[in-house]
């Protein structure tokens, strides 16, 4: 089986755009540093094309065996595609056990099908950093920070609960200490006076306003009768004969004597109209001189 079976065709559209962006992130200077490191450890020449020299997985397996002996038990030197893929898979498993994080490791197709050489380079750099952390002399990558584990006694852990963290703010400066619910009466007093308890109920706090100036003292509900009198007269309460201002006036025109609208009303003048006399028993009922009413209906 030829290797052409595993090669992909040219990419178009979005796939080509993604492939170009990944290719732009490839660092050729890092490639030269990795080449010198791998060739120095394994003693084998990679070739002019760096990725093609690693494609069969033979150099990679020998390289991890140098860093960690016994990592790959068998290295396939066959030219068959599945043997080369098997070498790459064994290398990936070996560097995972060596300590490289899974998110830093490339996939087999990234190298074998030339789909993402940038990820392959990132994996080799992560392997160099892990080797430097374990004490190998490597000029590539960075050394990982060592874990600084601390063990605390249970008493120390319980004491930490009394500490206010920075995320909870501070207990200095202005605070809401002593604040009550909205609308609740609050007593204001001077602590310099030495009074531990608030003042009595006769004290008006600042939140309740002031007892000076205009106020609503003596005000009643709207529409309620209010007695108006002069305090100089010595009368605490006015009698019922006084008409308050809220009740109007008893002078001028009024509706006194008015009847319901539409009822007949008898109008007569007592100077000209005699007092009506009602007949006694036995007298005739018709007496035109005794009744002088005019119906104004």
UniProtKB/Swiss-Prot annotation:
Biological process according to GO: actin filament organization; actomyosin structure organization
Annotated keywords: Actin-binding, Calmodulin-binding, Phosphoprotein, Repeat
Protein name: Calponin-1
Residues modified to Phosphoserine: 175
Record-annotated Calponin-homology (CH) domain positions: 28-131
Stretches forming Calponin-like repeats: 164-189, 204-229, 243-268
Keyword hit for Phosphoprotein: yes
Organism in which the protein naturally occurs: Mustela putorius furo (European domestic ferret)
Superkingdom classification of source: Eukaryota
SUPFAM superfamilies in alphabetical order: Calponin-homology domain, CH-domain (SSF47576)
Similarity-based family: Belongs to the calponin family.
InterPro entries registered for this protein in UniProt: Calponin-like, Calponin/LIMCH1, Calponin_repeat, CH_dom, CH_dom_sf, SM22_calponin
Chain positions with Phosphothreonine modification: 170, 180, 184, 259
One GO MF term: calmodulin binding
UniProt keyword RNA-binding present: no
Gene Ontology CC terms, in alphabetical order: actin cytoskeleton
A Pfam cross-reference name: Calponin
Protein's job: Thin filament-associated protein that is implicated in the regulation and modulation of smooth muscle contraction. It is capable of binding to actin, calmodulin and tropomyosin. The interaction of calponin with actin inhibits the actomyosin Mg-ATPase activity.
């Amino acid at each position: 089986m030829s290797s052409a079976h595993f090669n992909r065709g040219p990419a178009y559209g979005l796939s080509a755009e993604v492939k170009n962006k990944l290719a732009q992130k490839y660092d050729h200077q890092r490639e030269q540093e990795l080449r010198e490191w791998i060739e120095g450890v394994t003693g084998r020449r990679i070739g002019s094309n760096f990725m093609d020299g690693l494609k069969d997985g033979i150099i990679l397996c020998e390289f991890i065996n140098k860093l960690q002996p016994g990592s790959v038990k068998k290295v396939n030197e066959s030219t068959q595609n599945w043997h080369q893929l098997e070498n790459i898979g064994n290398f990936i498993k070996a560097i995972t056990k060596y300590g490289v994080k899974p998110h830093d490791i490339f996939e087999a197709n990234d190298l074998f099908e030339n789909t993402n050489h940038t990820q392959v380079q990132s994996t080799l750099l992560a392997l160099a950093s892990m080797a430097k952390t374990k004490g190998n002399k490597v000029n590539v990558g960075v050394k990982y920070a060592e874990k600084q584990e601390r063990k605390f006694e249970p008493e120390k852990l319980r004491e930490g609960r009394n500490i206010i963290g920075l995320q909870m703010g501070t207990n200095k400066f202005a605070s809401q200490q002593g604040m009550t619910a909205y609308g609740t009466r609050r007593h204001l007093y001077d602590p310099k006076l030495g009074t531990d308890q608030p003042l009595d109920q006769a004290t008006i706090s600042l939140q309740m306003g002031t007892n000076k100036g205009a106020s609503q003292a003596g005000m009643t509900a709207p529409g309620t009768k209010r007695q108006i009198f002069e305090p100089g007269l010595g009368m605490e309460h006015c009698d019922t004969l006084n008409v308050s201002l809220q009740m109007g006036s008893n002078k001028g025109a009024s509706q006194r004597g008015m009847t319901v609208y539409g009822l007949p009303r008898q109008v007569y003048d007592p100077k000209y109209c005699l007092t009506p006399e009602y007949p006694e028993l036995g007298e005739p009922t018709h007496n035109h001189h005794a009744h002088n009413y005019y119906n104004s209906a």
